[in-house]
Amino acid sequence: RPSDLDQMPCLSALMGAGQRQPLRASFPAVTWPVQANMLTGCRPSQHGVVGNGFYWRESHEVEMWTAWNEKIQAPQVWDLMHQDSPELTSAVWFPMLSKGCGADFVCMPAPVHNPDGSESLWCYTTPTELYGDLRDELGHFPLKNFWGPLSSIDSTAWIVDSAVMAAGS
């Protein structure tokens, strides 16, 4: 809302140099469809993402939180940018459907679910070795602080620090 910009001088300065448009609500208002809206500029009826999981009728299987980018059925911002300027470097940090996307740099949580029921912390990255470098410098991504009752600024700080580190590489 324009009135909120008075309380945010940095964002206000950014908006003063650019453009803004009203945000229209989307349905369903859950993580994957909303992120796909932002990455494509399209509504769920165009990009095809309507939930955080899928039910495959043929196999009677439910697929939840697998996060492969092929589910998005519309060009994304980095695809459009690369069409116009192939030399441009693009990055996407933490949208849940970014595995296998066309961005040059990608980072998103992808914990390993072990056969014994335990979980090992990990992130999917492009290039593949990027998470090892980020982990060596920043420690593992604090997944327990990303959502749920233990959510905290720790996960946000890691995301910001990792993006800054990757941008400098």
Give residue spans per PLM region.
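Solvent-exposed loop/turn segments at secondary-structure junctions
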Residues: 1, 29, 97-100
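Beta-strand elements within well-structured catalytic alpha/beta cores of enzymes
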Residues: 1-3, 13-14, 38, 81, ...
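Short, structured active-site-proximal loop/turn typified by the sulfatase FGly-forming signature C/S-X-P-X-R
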Residues: 3-37, 41-45, 91
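His/Asp/Glu-rich, glycine-adjacent segments
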Residues: 42-169
